[in-house]
Amino acid sequence: MIIGIDVGGTHTDAVLIGSGVLKKFKTPSADLKKSVILALEKLIDSNIDIERISISTTLVTNSISKGNIEKAGIFLICDSPLSFLYENIIPYIYTAHSYIDHRGEVIKDLSSNDLSSALEYFISNKIKNIGVVSKFSPRNPVLEKKAGDFFRKNGFNVVEGSTLSGKLDFPRRIMTTYLSSSVYSIYRSIISDMESSIRSILKDTEIMIVKADGGVVPISDAIKRPVDTILSGPAASIMGSLFHLKDFSEDFIIIDTGGTTSDIGFFINSSPVIERDGISINNYKTLVRALKVFSMPLGGDSVFNWSGNELVISNVREGIPYCFGGPRVTVTDLALFGENKKSEEGFIKEGLIDKIKIIEEKIISFIESYLKKAISLVNSRHIYTIKEFFENRVFNPKKVLLVGGAAPYFKRFLDRLGYEVIIPKDYEVCNAIGAALARPSYELNLFANTLDARLSIPEIDYYEKIDRYFDETLARKIVFDKLKSITNFDVEIVEEEVFNMVRGFNTIGKNIRIVGQVKPGLII
């Protein structure tokens, strides 16, 4: 059996999966350790054998969205001063004017003076987390590794950009590395608390973490690359929705309704839309491959404030809805108005009883505008799903799958907008279902250098001699074959980098890097 747990900012949801959803449980997330332990105690009895636990969380994403990230610095290795391009986003950058060229050759090595000056700079600014990023490092990470080793020996937490992505988009790699560094300690603390809570009850069960692309990885891998799991919570919700949508061919929107934020996902032919080239979070354009999500600052616990004569919907949570004993009326109370006397009492108490119609129209207009923005975003470029690519496809959804705790309360508003609304069974724990059923994201990295006549896939200790005629077609086949030997799931190539090594005017070899992984999906 499998347990899925989603740790959100408001609630922790958990499910026990066997032949379907056997048990489910929801508890407040105020104390992370206690909420995880309580969830496990409610789901497990002595006769159950737990095969794995998969976890998703929005806690790190919430920290980034609210600006609650740690001080982090970037050690930039390139041949031109670029720090001024990032100074409004990254306060602490040290540029070392060493560099590797586009062929991966070291043109100017790192000097001891650069390293010692950078060390002094970061210490004086009380920086503990450092991201090291070298231009063209995917073609040769030697300078990143040299700097990374130096800073580690001096007590810093270090993230090297080339370990996060093999793509050559230098600006996005800088931002990805910075983001990973700035959540390094926060993420480790969250993961450590989760792991210790689980281990207090289940000593040997495999623990997996949901990635932003909807796959799951062992907790030991996730902790090395925290940036890959930043949108873990929304990804789990989308994978949980896939459980309900696998037989649908229409365009669909999924809305995961939360306390003060709701996440919007997109489906075409029962397949979620994906950001293949990398997501943007706040001002951070990254190389993190993720399921496409659009956040709407509205949830079941959102309250109403007035600025003069203007109604303002607040996304600052002030407690549970009034009808459930909270301090103020919320979107949930509005949805229940006319059915729940407690909700009506709350609107009277706040002097809003004569403004019900205005508030409802504002909510409906607010949701409509965000859905239009979300659909426009999907249609603004070529559409990729986890199964296929659409070049001139127009996404035009008529149906909405509502999940999350506030789903029943949002239906009233979406009905008014003309959508066909579906609320599935176990809607309130859809995210935990997605975490439980998401496929393991087995990944293999192939490196080949025809000049040195060597090929390696480190994850499986595979090494092979190759000849000068070896190319990317053969490399892809090896990756596919090796992945298929360890999994029955569909596999895909997610990164490919090939460049010719030139001496004089002659091509003397090829350097090839191929990354393959299991396609995101469900294990059933």
Identify the function of each model-found stretch:
Residues M1-I524:
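N-terminally biased helix-coil "hinge/interface" segments that flank
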